[in-house]
Amino acid sequence: MKAQALLLCSLVLLAQSTDVDDEGSGEVFLQKVSSSVSITASLATTMLTSVTNKTTQNVSVTTIDSLSTSPMHNATSNTSYSQTTPYSQTSLSSSVLISTPQMLNSTPNKPLSSTKLTPKSQSSSQSTKTTKQASKNLTTSKLATSFSSTYMTTSDQPYSNNTANKILLNTTYIYLSTLSKITKLFMQEQNKTTQEPFELITPSSTERDSSTLSKHTNKLKPFKPKTQPIVNMQRTWIYPLTGIVSIVVLLIIMSCIHCYIRRFDEHFE
């Protein structure tokens, strides 16, 4: 029944993807690029075993479906599962590969791959082993940018709580150590004080004579404190006063000259 269903699905996809009209009634890619669609479905193996004593069944089906629409994209899926009842458990695994090749020789090849795995459980000892299942681990590298570049790799496989706690402790230790280093450097920079050298002049043992001491004492100038006036008066009134005095003096000089000239004229008349 499953094989018939797969064949019907492949025929429906083939009918929908082909073009009948000359103008094109199906999907048209960029500028009517000729696209070749090939769909293949193959049923690999189908096994059915039954045991009358314990009524166990084991079904192993492997299907490989590939859909390629060149030059746009192609997809391939591989699925394998086994089912045994009632004395064994069920295991299911699937892998999907999606790749996008070069489009019209203009864009670079960008392959995308993703794998989703479910853990396979142990079946009973009397059930037959299924076919080999594809497995792939995904590793992702992450850059931790907390004051220092630290690389961590995590895998998609399940791990225990102990490993998770170890990773958490390692990351917190690295963060705290870098933080403590930065705080130490900051405190050291703040504690630095500027020291200026100074010279202390002291008389040596050879300069204890009175002559040398008198020379040093003569060079010293007596300290005179500056006496500040009690009242600081504003001196802006001096400028108009000087102007008035100068005008009065000029008037006196001119009057004197005028009197002298009048007397001189009277004398010659």
Swiss-Prot record:
<feature type="glycosylation site" description="N-linked (GlcNAc...) asparagine; by host">
    <location>
        <position position="58"/>
    </location>
</feature>
<protein>
    <recommendedName>
        <fullName>Gene 51 glycoprotein</fullName>
    </recommendedName>
</protein>
<feature type="glycosylation site" description="N-linked (GlcNAc...) asparagine; by host">
    <location>
        <position position="74"/>
    </location>
</feature>
<feature type="glycosylation site" description="N-linked (GlcNAc...) asparagine; by host">
    <location>
        <position position="161"/>
    </location>
</feature>
<feature type="compositionally biased region" description="Polar residues">
    <location>
        <begin position="103"/>
        <end position="112"/>
    </location>
</feature>
<feature type="glycosylation site" description="N-linked (GlcNAc...) asparagine; by host">
    <location>
        <position position="191"/>
    </location>
</feature>
<feature type="compositionally biased region" description="Low complexity">
    <location>
        <begin position="76"/>
        <end position="87"/>
    </location>
</feature>
<feature type="glycosylation site" description="N-linked (GlcNAc...) asparagine; by host">
    <location>
        <position position="137"/>
    </location>
</feature>
<feature type="compositionally biased region" description="Low complexity">
    <location>
        <begin position="113"/>
        <end position="136"/>
    </location>
</feature>
<feature type="glycosylation site" description="N-linked (GlcNAc...) asparagine; by host">
    <location>
        <position position="78"/>
    </location>
</feature>
<keyword id="KW-0325">Glycoprotein</keyword>
<feature type="region of interest" description="Disordered">
    <location>
        <begin position="103"/>
        <end position="137"/>
    </location>
</feature>
<feature type="glycosylation site" description="N-linked (GlcNAc...) asparagine; by host">
    <location>
        <position position="53"/>
    </location>
</feature>
<feature type="glycosylation site" description="N-linked (GlcNAc...) asparagine; by host">
    <location>
        <position position="170"/>
    </location>
</feature>
<feature type="region of interest" description="Disordered">
    <location>
        <begin position="67"/>
        <end position="87"/>
    </location>
</feature>
